[in-house]
């Protein structure tokens, strides 16, 4: 079955597998959203079923909640948990300071709330997500539906004074209709190409009326686990300043990989 998975999927899996090893009995764990985070949820589910791992998960989207229930992870709400030991999530881009762009999966608001309510945030990603400067991936911002075009115009006007290379934005669509987040909002994708000052941009965007949250995660991520298609894994801890390398044996099992299609 290993021939059925692309090198990128293998990289995502080994990163998720390595990150799952950070989870211990009794932990309250934030469960991210997206294709890489889905591997993590599957890995944790296998540990719950086969190793007796006892954890409670807080999902960052309805999709993640559904998958977590399918694989046997006990779920609670963030209000019930109050605070989390660890959140593990993917990223669309990350730089050397572990600043992130997230929100490609449409769950940036809940993802940021859960991540900031955790003692530690670990990002899992393949090597292709590492960039020298953020911005090649469109930056998502969540806006309320009321007056979204006005919010869009204000955002584009604000970008004129920001250190970015592009200033256009598009409303994310789901077929012929606007994409709707779990919170009932829309998403504008900002095509910036390069973000010279992510910290400043994150602060300024959230001051614009109608903007609920943006996909820049600044000073939130503590560790990144980078997977490679050959099974190599690199763990970078921004707080400790350490870099560890490891190798994960890639053994596919039907119960772990079946129906993982996102």
Swiss-Prot record:
EC number: 5.3.1.6
UniProt catalytic activity: aldehydo-D-ribose 5-phosphate = D-ribulose 5-phosphate
Annotated GO biological process: D-ribose metabolic process; pentose-phosphate shunt, non-oxidative branch
Positions annotated as active site in the UniProt record: 111 (proton acceptor)
Record GO terms (molecular function): ribose-5-phosphate isomerase activity
Entry keyword annotation includes Isomerase: yes
Residues given in the record as substrate binding sites: 33-36, 89-92, 102-105, 129
GO cellular component: cytosol
Superkingdom assignment: Bacteria
Top-level enzyme category: isomerase
SUPFAM superfamilies, alphabetized: D-ribose-5-phosphate isomerase (RpiA), lid domain (SSF75445), NagB/RpiA/CoA transferase-like (SSF100950)
Record key words, sorted: Isomerase
Cited CDD domains: RPI_A
UniProt keyword Isomerase, yes or no: yes
InterPro entries: NagB/RpiA_transferase-like (IPR037171), Ribose5P_isomerase_typA_subgr (IPR020672), Ribose5P_isomerase_type_A (IPR004788)
Pfam family, one: Rib_5-P_isom_A
Database matches in HAMAP family: Rib_5P_isom_A
Family: Belongs to the ribose 5-phosphate isomerase family.
Record text on subunit structure and interactions: Homodimer.
Protein name: Ribose-5-phosphate isomerase A
Organism: Ruegeria sp. (strain TM1040) (Silicibacter sp.)
Gene: rpiA
